């Protein structure tokens, strides 16, 4: 009951302020010059994934840990707070690897410093914290949030901000957006295998209150001349996929239409049972896989019945355009 009340309050907040925040979707366009700082830099996760980001040649320029300010970690400076880190490094993005109890405050600290792109990997952030964050987020137009509870965002062969395996990515022409982390990797691997590669891959996360949705990413993909096709991976719960379908119906048509392939997880999920992600639940008869699949197909999207068919379905969709 409390979760439903929180959800209703968040939706009310969204409607009035969303347009102001929506202008920040361009902050998703990361590249080889994007400067990244790490919040929770010296912790176990921050260290491990910070190393991997550096190995991918991401421009990590420092990190934040108030208790170790003034020292170095992984050969990079550690700052007292995000504001100091941004002032001294000119950071364009921040990635957050801090425990759930402190993650909401970490996002707000990055917002206070007006970091253009904030990627929060942390899972299990209390919903009440995220409602507070979302309320603040929608009232400003400087910071774009990806996540929480997500694998991050990657511009293939240029910049990796998150926990995704870099080696499966290859520069190419497919834009990928997904609520599921592991299914994102499946789509990436398949598009690499069939020779398409990727432009930008965004894991938007599986929580009910996230900073970036399907439509934000579709905006980027449809405007980007390098992106020739789109893969959208959804799951049960909420109405994000139906809203994305309506957006595609209106904005992706005619001679310049880009092929879109989708997979929806949770076809056999029983109503009322949460399936992994906090937002993956059929509630009140809404958010079923069937509703989402029908809406997407009506918008001209090719919906596969298995994630193993994403690559071949995209190849077939391209052949249909020739």
Swiss-Prot record:
Family annotation (InterPro entries): Cit_synth/succinyl-CoA_lig_AS, Citrt_syn/SCS-alpha_CS, CoA-bd, CoA_lig_alpha, NAD(P)-bd_dom_sf, SUCC_ACL_C, Succinyl-CoA_synth-like
Transit peptide endpoints, chain numbering: 1-21
Record Gene3D superfamilies: NAD(P)-binding Rossmann-like Domain, Succinyl-CoA synthetase domains
Pfam families in alphabetical order: CoA_binding, Ligase_CoA
Enzyme class at the top of the EC tree: ligase
This enzyme's EC code(s): 6.2.1.4, 6.2.1.5
Molecular-function annotations in GO: nucleotide binding; succinate-CoA ligase (ADP-forming) activity; succinate-CoA ligase (GDP-forming) activity
Residues where CoA binds: 42-45, 68, 121-123
Residues the entry annotates as binding substrate: 185
Keyword NADP: no
Stated role: Succinyl-CoA synthetase functions in the citric acid cycle (TCA), coupling the hydrolysis of succinyl-CoA to the synthesis of either ATP or GTP and thus represents the only step of substrate-level phosphorylation in the TCA. The alpha subunit of the enzyme binds the substrates coenzyme A and phosphate, while succinate binding and specificity for either ATP or GTP is provided by different beta subunits.
Family, similarity comment: Belongs to the succinate/malate CoA ligase alpha subunit family.
Protein's name in the database: Succinate--CoA ligase [ADP/GDP-forming] subunit alpha, mitochondrial
């Amino acid at each position: 009951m409390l979760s439903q009340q929180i959800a209703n309050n968040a939706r009310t907040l969204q409607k009035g302020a969303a347009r102001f925040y929506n202008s920040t979707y361009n902050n998703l366009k990361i590249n080889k010059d994007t400067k990244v700082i790490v919040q929770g830099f010296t912790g176990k996760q921050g260290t491990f994934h910070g190393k991997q980001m550096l190995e991918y040649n991401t421009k990590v320029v420092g990190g934040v840990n108030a208790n170790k300010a003034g020292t170095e970690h992984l050969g990079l400076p550690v700052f007292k707070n995000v504001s100091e880190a941004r002032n001294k490094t000119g950071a364009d993005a921040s990635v957050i690897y801090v425990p759930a109890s402190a993650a909401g405050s970490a996002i707000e600290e990055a917002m206070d410093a007006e970091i253009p792109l904030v990627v929060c990997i942390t899972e299990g952030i209390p919903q009440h914290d995220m409602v507070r964050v979302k309320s603040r987020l929608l009232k400003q137009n400087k910071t774009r949030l990806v996540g929480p509870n997500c694998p991050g965002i990657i511009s293939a062969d240029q910049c990796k901000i998150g926990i995704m395996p870099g080696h499966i990515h290859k520069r190419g022409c497919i834009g990928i957006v997904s609520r599921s982390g592991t299914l994102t990797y499946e789509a990436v691997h398949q598009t690499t295998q069939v020779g398409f590669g990727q432009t930008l891959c965004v894991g938007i996360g599986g929580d009910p209150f996230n900073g970036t949705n399907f439509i934000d990413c579709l905006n980027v993909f449809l405007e980007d001349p390098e992106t020739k096709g789109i893969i959208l991976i959804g799951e049960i719960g909420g109405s994000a996929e139906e809203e994305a379908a309506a957006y595609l119906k209106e904005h992706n048509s005619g001679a310049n239409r880009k092929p879109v392939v989708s997979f929806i997880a949770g076809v056999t999920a029983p109503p009322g049972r949460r399936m992994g992600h906090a937002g993956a639940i059929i509630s009140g008869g809404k958010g079923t896989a069937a509703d989402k699949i029908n809406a997407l197909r009506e918008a001209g999207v090719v919906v596969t019945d298995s994630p193993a068919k994403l690559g071949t379905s995209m190849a077939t969709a391209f052949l249909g355009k020739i």
